[in-house]
């Protein structure tokens, strides 16, 4: 292969974190020639902050990434050293999987996936510049001055754009601890007609486990049997399982923190970027919740072959001497040795309202953004965006139409729609409460929602497709069996069934009717003589129970979605000057001109846009012949 051909690609992905790896893998799965540029091959898939995958809302994203053929769930299964199902006592919509991960095992799993993926090349070089011609990106320039050309480029640069690390009143440039920032690229992007702001995030000090007294802490074991993250995974993938621990801050801790606030970069005005609301620093907690006597700390191992632990809950940028005193004031940490100081990092992000649903920028064709550059926080949010951006970069390189999930299809759709419609002024984190259709967007049915779409797009391989079809066939056959299998009230096995129910069976009843009763679970029904044997596949069995038990609620939500779909499919002209529409208030005009929503549905979700304003908008555009339906 000539040197010239080696330097031309269909898709270039800049950055090898959680967004970049999913983007590069997605593009390569579509069969296009893909280059992943990373400043350091050894940090591919690195967990820069907490050593965990999943959680409320986040676990849903991981399942969706997996349903579309992504790598995050598989890597979590291979690296997970403690698995738990959160909200296990609540309804299926809000149940979520979380895995404590071994950092090194996770990186190994990601790197192996990248290095064995056909159509994907990896090159170690930072990116300093974009090649832009006639408002279209055509390539990148590396630190060495090497030029790589491409049809599309995906930027997944994390916290590296103009990164500034703060510990107390001291600060220095960095993309994260130990890594240089991407200042040249940040300067280049600031020269583009895109809105840019600053955000900040932080991380706690790391502690040597042999200096910690775990005996005075509350042990937090994982679930047994352990949940499995990937639809293609199994418990045999899991390494050794170990516990986490819980301890708490106290009034002495809080007084130490308060005494150091005058040297805090957050409270002395040094940091201007807004931090994550749902993962605040310990100094933020003490100030905002001054009446609270203690705060919970999850003491999490960083891996099986390291002595470092991650004290989840005391993220801080206080001076190091204050960090030492606050850590040693905590029960079990009295003799704690800090191996790495906590710090805050400030970085550039770009207003995601300047993005299309495909995550392509509106002003530079072929340029896609994913991850923290869009104002999000979290590995899972980054991975979800990366997959969609990489997919659409590859589709555009093949001259195909873009695809992005709708709000009623996936949490990915909620994430992208929230960002591109509403923007964000603080690091955006996913929660189940953000999804209005969460009864349909469950962890258990992510494959049912997305795998067929992924197959049609080219994201899903033969093995996953075969496994999915086998599961779906089992679910449908078992639902039909329960619907058509009736037990008479005088049958010998009714005694077993009556032991499961609150009110005894008084007439002939089907398995489906029994399973609709809230107190009966599929696994118990399948153990009775009459309805045995049940399904061996626990995922298929879970699906049967949920589909039957919640059928009425699911149908109602599907009807609601059908009503809303009319607005979601009605496209708005872009760009458009909404001042031309008589009757709209100045506030509505300003917001519509600022957001430039792609559809009527997106316009209706902008804060301050009333139903009356939407009606006026529709009437005017219809008269002008400017309304059209999406394909």
UniProtKB/Swiss-Prot annotation:
Keywords: Cytoplasm, FAD, Flavoprotein, NAD, tRNA processing. It is found in: Cytoplasm. The keyword Cytoplasm applies. Its cofactor is FAD. Pfam families: GIDA, GIDA_C_1st, SAM_GIDA_C. It comes from the Bacteria. The keyword Cytoplasm applies. GO terms for biological process: tRNA methylation; tRNA wobble uridine modification. FAD binds at residues 15-20. Coiled coil: none annotated. GO terms for molecular function: flavin adenine dinucleotide binding. NAD(+) binds at residues 275-289. Belongs to the MnmG family. Homodimer. Heterotetramer of two MnmE and two MnmG subunits. This is tRNA uridine 5-carboxymethylaminomethyl modification enzyme MnmG. It comes from Idiomarina loihiensis (strain ATCC BAA-735 / DSM 15497 / L2-TR).
């Amino acid at each position: 292969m000539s040197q010239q051909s080696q330097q031309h690609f269909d898709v270039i992905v800049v950055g090898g974190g959680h967004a970049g790896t999913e983007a590069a893998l997605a593009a390569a799965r579509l069969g296009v020639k893909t280059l992943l540029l990373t400043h350091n091959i050894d940090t591919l898939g690195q967990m820069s902050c907490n050593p965990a995958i999943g959680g409320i809302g986040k676990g849903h994203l991981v399942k969706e990434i997996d349903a579309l053929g992504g790598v995050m769930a598989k890597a979590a299964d291979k690296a997970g050293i403690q698995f738990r199902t959160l909200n296990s006592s609540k309804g299926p919509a809000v149940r979520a999987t979380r895995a404590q991960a071994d950092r090194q095992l996770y990186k190994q799993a990601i790197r192996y996936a990248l290095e064995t993926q056909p159509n994907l090349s990896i090159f170690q070089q930072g990116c300093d510049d974009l090649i832009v011609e006639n408002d279209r990106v055509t390539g990148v320039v590396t630190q060495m001055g090497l030029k790589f050309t491409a049809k599309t480029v995906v930027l997944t640069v994390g916290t590296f754009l103009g990164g500034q690390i703060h510990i107390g009143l001291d600060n220095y440039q960095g993309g994260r601890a130990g890594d240089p920032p991407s200042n040249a690229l940040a300067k280049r992007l600031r020269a583009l007609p895109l809105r840019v702001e600053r955000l900040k995030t932080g991380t706690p000090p790391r502690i040597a486990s042999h200096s910690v007294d775990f005996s005075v802490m509350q042990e937090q074991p994982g679930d047994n049997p352990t949940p499995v993250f990937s639809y293609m995974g199994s418990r045999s993938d899991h390494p050794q399982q170990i516990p986490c621990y819980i301890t708490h801050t106290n009034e002495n801790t809080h007084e130490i923190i308060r005494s150091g606030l005058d040297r805090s970069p957050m409270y002395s005005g040094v940091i201007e970027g807004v931090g994550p609301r749902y993962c605040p620093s310990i100094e933020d907690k003490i100030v905002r919740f001054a009446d609270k006597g203690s705060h919970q700390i999850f003491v999490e191992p960083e891996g099986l072959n390291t002595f470092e632990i991650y004290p989840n809950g005391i993220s801080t940028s206080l001076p190091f001497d204050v960090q030492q005193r606050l850590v040693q004031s905590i029960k079990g940490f009295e003799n704690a040795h800090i191996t790495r100081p906590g710090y805050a990092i400030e970085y550039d992000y770009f207003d995601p309202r300047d993005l299309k649903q495909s995550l392509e920028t509106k002003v530079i064709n072929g340029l896609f953004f994913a991850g923290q550059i869009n104002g999000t926080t979290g590995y899972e949010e980054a991975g979800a965006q990366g997959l969609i951006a990489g997919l659409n970069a590859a589709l555009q390189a093949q001259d195909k139409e873009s695809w992005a999930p709708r709000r009623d299809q996936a949490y990915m759709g909620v994430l992208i729609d929230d960002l591109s419609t509403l923007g964000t002024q603080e690091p955006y984190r996913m929660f189940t409460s953000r999804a209005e259709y969460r009864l349909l967007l469950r962890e258990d049915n992510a494959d049912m929602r997305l795998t067929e779409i992924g197959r049609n797009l080219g994201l899903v391989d033969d093995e996953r497709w075969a496994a999915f079809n086998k599961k779906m066939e089992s679910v449908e056959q078992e639902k039909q069996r329960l619907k058509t299998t009736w037990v008479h009230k005088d049958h010998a096995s009714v005694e077993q069934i009556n032991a499961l129910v609150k009110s005894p069976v008084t007439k002939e009843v089907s398995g489906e009717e029994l399973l609709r009763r809230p107190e009966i679970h599929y696994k118990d029904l399948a153990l009775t003589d009459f309805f045995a044997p049940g399904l061996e596949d626990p995922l298929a069995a879970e699906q049967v129970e949920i589909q039957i038990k919640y059928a009425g609620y699911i149908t109602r939500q599907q009807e609601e979605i059908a009503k809303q779909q009319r607005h979601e499919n009605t496209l708005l002209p872009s760009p458009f000057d909404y001042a031309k529409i008589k009757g709209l208030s100045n506030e509505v005009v300003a917001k519509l001109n600022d957001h430039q929503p792609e559809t009527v549905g997106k316009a209706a979700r902008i804060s301050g846009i009333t139903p009356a304003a939407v009606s006026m908008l529709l009437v005017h555009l219809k008269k002008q012949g400017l309304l059209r339906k999406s394909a």
